[in-house]
A protein has these predicted regions:
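A local structural motif
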Residues: 2-3, 45, 125-132
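Non-transmembrane alpha-helical segments in soluble domains
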Residues: 50, 62, 121, 143-146
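C-terminal capping/lid region of NAD(P)-dependent oxidoreductase domains
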Residues: 128-135, 143-170
Length: 170
């Protein structure tokens, strides 16, 4: 296994949820200095960082990489609404730590979806994986559900059940 696993979220409720999912420690980026807290929790640096946020959180991670670390870029929600996207200002931290940074786009792995679905269903059944979903009901809830992703209102995967009572979810 790996460890310790550190979760970063923007509310106490989300940090509590991360702890319940098994993280060893949580950082509330709205209340704490992320870079300082990462240094405290991981004095030898980050070995693997999976980024969905970008911006200042990614920069804090890049400043705290262990030698030969791996950084995976999956999303950058902090940048999606920005007119001018800047990317990490401190990307040269990768050179000093001899780290690797690469992108991950789930749809490039479509050939693996069926196998992944079977594997993950097994993990859920064996209680090795918990799927957290935040479901809004009704087609008319779609705009608010989308906006909620950008404002941090969701707890888990945000889905919309188009027809309440049905299993058709987007």
């Amino acid at each position: 296994g790996c460890g310790p696993v550190i979760g970063i979220a923007g509310s106490e409720k989300k940090c509590q949820m991360i702890g319940e999912l098994g993280a060893d420690a949580m950082i509330n980026y709205r209340e704490e200095n992320v870079a300082e807290r990462v240094t405290e929790l991981l004095p030898d640096g980050i070995d693997v960082y999976f980024d969905n946020v970008g911006g200042a959180i990614l920069e804090a991670a890049l400043d705290n990489l262990a030698r030969d670390a791996r950084v995976v870029l999956c999303g950058s929600i902090s940048e999606y609404q920005q007119e001018h996207r800047t990317g990490p200002k401190n990307y040269t931290s990768l050179r000093a730590s001899e780290a690797d940074m690469r992108g991950f786009f789930v749809y490039n792995h479509a050939a693996d979806f069926e196998r992944a679905e079977v594997d993950m269903a097994g993990w859920i059944k064996a209680e090795k994986l918990r799927a957290l979903v935040d479901i809004s009901d009704g087609f008319e809830s779609m705009p608010d559900a989308l906006i909620g992703l950008y404002t941090g209102e969701n707890l888990g995967k945000r889905l919309v059940r188009v027809m309440p009572g049905e299993d058709v979810i987007f």
